[in-house]
C-alpha cells in the first residue's frame, strides 16, 4: 500500500518544513497545494522536493478535493501545514503500510493555543479522520 501526504498552505514558512519532514518516513508522495503565499513557503517546499502546486483559493473543501484528485497513492494522509505527527505515530504508519490497511483511520489531535496544550473543555481528544483510501 502507498500513502500520499496532502498539505494545504498559505504563508506557512514557519511550519511547512517541519510538517514535510514529519511525513517523510511513511509518505510515498507529498503534495502541497499553495494559494500563492507571499512569504517563503514556495521556496521551502521546492527545496524539499515535494510536488508543489499553486492554485487560487476556492475554499477548504474544494482545495482538499483538488488535492485528492492529484495523487496516485492508495491512501491519503491529510495533514495541516502546522501539524506534525510525532515519532510514535510515524512509526505506526510505517508499520501499518507493511500490513493490511483497511478502512478509515482517525487520530487524537491535541491543540496548542498560545503555547499551551489544551487538554480540557472537550478540546482533547480532538478526533480527526486523517488517513483514508483515495477516492473515498
What are these regions (language model features)?
Residues 22, 34-43, 80:
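A conserved acidic beta->alpha catalytic loop
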Residues 26, 48-49, 127:
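Short, structured coil segments at secondary-structure junctions
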Residues 1-22:
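N-proximal low-complexity "stem/linker" segments adjacent to membrane-targeting elements
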Residues 17, 39-48, 88-89:
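Acidic helix N-cap motif at the loop->helix transition within catalytic regions
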Residues 21-30:
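Short, acidic, metal-binding catalytic loop of nucleotide-sugar glycosyltransferases
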